[in-house]
A protein has these predicted regions:
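Short, well-ordered loop/turn elements at secondary-structure boundaries
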Residues: 155-159
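A structural signal for short, well-ordered beta-strand segments and their strand-loop junctions
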Residues: 160-165
Length: 166
């Protein structure tokens, strides 16, 4: 079974409920509490996205991108001991105000600039295996655009973002 990064947009009240209850957090991580449109499956893209940003841009953008993928705080530490949880990757979140800040910062990051920093054999530059694709730029571009759009919508709707590996 593949382990990929998942993000979901939630209202602050839903995040608060998940902080109080591991059962509620499990329902969220089981895709039962929010519409499909509020989910983003980032596949294995976080590491290549971070490395591409590191190669192309300043630390302000790298910090914002890292926060967008890692969150600021674990949602509910008790969830690590819940049946079926992936304890090596705790569920974390960004509160609504942090989402606004991260989305605003990422808005200044130009995807074409990030992609231009990648050589043709970019998988090695990204510290990743080549897998089935020789050129990683399309993969990075798709996931980068999806992440930026996801955060723009979360900021517009004043939602928090919860992230985990599943």
């Amino acid at each position: 079974v593949a382990v990929t990064q998942q993000l979901v947009r939630v209202p602050d009240a839903q995040l608060a409920a998940c902080r109080r209850s591991v059962e509620e957090l499990d329902r969220l991580c089981s895709f039962e509490l929010t519409p499909r449109a509020d989910h983003l499956d980032l596949d294995w893209a976080p590491a290549p996205l971070l490395r591409a940003c590191e190669l192309a841009s300043g630390s302000e953008y790298l910090v914002a991108l890292r926060r967008s993928l890692d969150g600021d705080a674990e949602v509910n530490p008790a969830y690590r001991h819940y049946a079926g949880a992936i304890w090596e990757h705790p569920v974390s979140a960004l509160e609504g105000p942090a989402v606004l800040h991260v989305a605003g910062t990422l808005r200044g990051l130009v995807p074409d600039t990030v992609l231009a920093s990648l050589p043709i054999d970019g998988w090695e530059a990204l510290g990743q295996s080549t897998g089935a694709m020789a050129d990683p730029r399309g993969y990075v571009a798709r996931h980068f655009a999806a992440l930026l759009d996801f955060y723009e919508e979360a900021a517009r709707r004043r939602l928090a973002v919860v992230m985990w590996w599943d």
